[in-house]
Amino acid sequence: EAQSIAQFGKAKDIVNVYAFFEENNTAYIIMEYIDGVLLKDYLEKQGKMEPKVALHIIDLIINAVKKIHSKGIIHRDISPDNIFISSEDAIKVFDFGAAQLNDSAEGKNCEKVIKVGYSAPEQYRDKSNQGFYTDIYSVGAILYQMLTGIKPMESTEREHKDTLKSPLELGVKIEPNVDRAIM
């Protein structure tokens, strides 16, 4: 995990690692302190966000995910549990414990890492191909929750019977193209 994060240096939207070492058969990672709130806690307290705020925050998350992907890394655990909101104009993505390289055999044969409501269908399957699209699914699920206040149903359930209502159907004031992108 530390080696994955260390590649990003002083990125403003990915947690910074200052040092990592192993001692007494235990791995230690020294990371920056982030003064803020987990997106998960924010959503539990506030329910949902105004569309303008949600779209701004998702843009910040997308930029962080683009940086992660630019290093050939699939995060595989993008969720509100792993995103800090440190101010209105800053987020931090962390927890790279499930990360895999996209072009490696590992990326093609990943173990299951499942975060209910945010995991793409391929994450539920044994020895499935996972790629950058795995993280993109998670980003869409986060945006859905930020706009509606509803955590999406499991992706595997949606494959069989999709009853998830779009943000527009739920009365969220967004453009139809944004609604289609989410769904």
Model-flagged regions — what are they?
Residues 85-89:
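Activation-loop N-terminal segment of eukaryotic-like protein kinases
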Residues 1-7:
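AlphaC helix of the eukaryotic protein kinase fold
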